[in-house]
Amino acid sequence: MKISIPTAKEMNTDLPYIEALPLREESQAVLDSLAHYSASELESFYKVSAEKAEEEYAHIQTLKDQSAKHYPALKLFDGLMYRHIKRDKLTEAEQAYLKDHVLITSALYGVVPALSPMAPHRLDFLMKLKVAGKTLKSHWKSAYDEALQDEDLIFSLLSSEFETVFSKEIREKMVTFKFMEDKAGQLKIHSTISKKARGAFLTALIEGQVQTVEQARKLRFAGFDYRPDLSSDLELVFVKQV
């Protein structure tokens, strides 16, 4: 059983760094494509300010010359979902669960264990980067599939941009999750609710050592309860009363 989560744009490098691993072939090809851009070209590629583009240019160059500092991926990313994941003061059992079951999907590193070393970088599958003439999604599809092909049960906490990198065969094995708020009988869903809830849900999976769909259905976390009337076999819906 594996749980897949996406990367985030926000990062925190105020952490002890760890030893890097050699870049896999697919990652090196992506890096080589990024390295073709000048700082001013990155400004329009990333749709960011000149200052931010310079920062990203520096990140790419340090990756290229192998001087980049690396951090455990789960702690490096600091978006809303990540800030709601229990990442510190884990018990031995929780550490082991994280190591055995949680994978991060990245447009630069591929599908990797949650505590794998990663360097700060900015890349997602909505960006129009060509790698050897292919889109990022096409470039990664076979490696993404390979990472999960032997799994019978996959919990996906991915956004659609990451989920659709996988082939239909893999996606059909995924159990997905929807998190909603019930305000005076009106069910609402938006990205802030979803991101916070994904982090809280992953924390509940880790703390509960969840291995099955049946166990996941029984979870209560951050005010959310499972709603069988809104769920299906492959989509579990959790609702919070507000």
Model-predicted regions and their roles:
Residues 2-89:
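Active-site helix-to-loop segments that bind/position phosphate- or nucleotide-bearing substrates
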Residues 86-233, 237-242:
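Internal, well-folded beta-alpha domain core
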